[in-house]
């Protein structure tokens, strides 16, 4: 059974590609979803985050205020960069353990596993059989984030700037999916790439 990495910058359409791969029979291990689960109210990870960043990162019900954390870690100053490093140091060890557990479940079930991991270029893995990068022009990504997700343009640009560069993501790719077209064109590319990987 194969282990395939899937990554792409924010706004690139990685989630759509992930859904298409699931439709093709892949077991999806979603790092963002794992992070959300690990940061649920009262979890050990969230407790450590509060110790580092203060109770201002919590909503009234004790859940994580993601926008509050984003304001702290996605700025362009040195304090924001240090905060992002600290956040990753808290979240990533717990994430890695859960990712490995889910990969094993998928393989034990006889499925090829796709690790949907936005930070794959920043945190390379040597256990991948292939890596799919969903690529899009950064200005198109900003446009999608602002017009589809309702994000502030400055926030969108800061988030993109805090991710690996487009060039760094493309450098780790064994396969590239260009998501500048429509969903039908994307589906065709995903089917072709999946066939190449699993064929």
Question: Where are the language model's segments positioned?
Answer:
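ATP-dependent small-molecule kinase phosphotransfer cores
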Residues: 33-111
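Small-molecule kinase domains that catalyze NTP-dependent phosphoryl transfer to phosphate-bearing small molecules
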Residues: 126-127, 147, 151-199
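Short, acidic/turn-prone active-site loops that include or flank metal/cofactor-
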Residues: 33-36, 137-139, 161, 183
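Amphipathic alpha-helical segments that mediate coupling or scaffolding at interfaces
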Residues: 9, 52, 72, 90, ...
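An amphipathic alpha-helix signature
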Residues: 24, 46-50, 138-146, 153, ...
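Well-ordered beta-strand positions
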Residues: 27, 33, 130, 174-175
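Walker A (P-loop) phosphate-binding motif
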Residues: 1-26, 31-33
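ATP-dependent NMP and nucleoside kinases share a basic, alpha-helical "lid"
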Residues: 100-108, 112-148
């Amino acid at each position: 059974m194969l282990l395939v990495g899937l990554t792409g910058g924010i706004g690139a359409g990685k989630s759509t590609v992930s859904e298409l791969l699931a439709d093709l029979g892949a077991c999806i291990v979603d790092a963002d979803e794992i992070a959300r689960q690990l940061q649920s109210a009262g979890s050990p990870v969230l407790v450590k985050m509060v110790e580092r960043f203060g109770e201002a990162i919590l909503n009234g019900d004790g859940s994580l205020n993601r926008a509050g954390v984003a304001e702290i870690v996605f700025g362009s100053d040195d304090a924001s960069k240090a905060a992002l490093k600290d956040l990753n140091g808290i979240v990533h060890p717990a994430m890695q353990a859960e990712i490995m557990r889910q990969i094993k479940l998928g393989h034990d079930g006889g499925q090829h596993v796709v690790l949907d991991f936005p930070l794959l270029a920043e945190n390379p893995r040597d256990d991948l059989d292939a890596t799919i990068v969903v690529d899009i022009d950064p200005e198109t990504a900003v446009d999608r984030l602002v017009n589809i997700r309702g994000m502030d343009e400055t926030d969108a640009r800061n988030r993109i700037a805090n991710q690996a560069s487009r060039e760094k993501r493309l450098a780790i790719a064994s396969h590239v999916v260009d998501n500048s077209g429509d969903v039908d064109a994307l589906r065709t590319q995903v089917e072709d790439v999946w066939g190449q990987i699993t064929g």
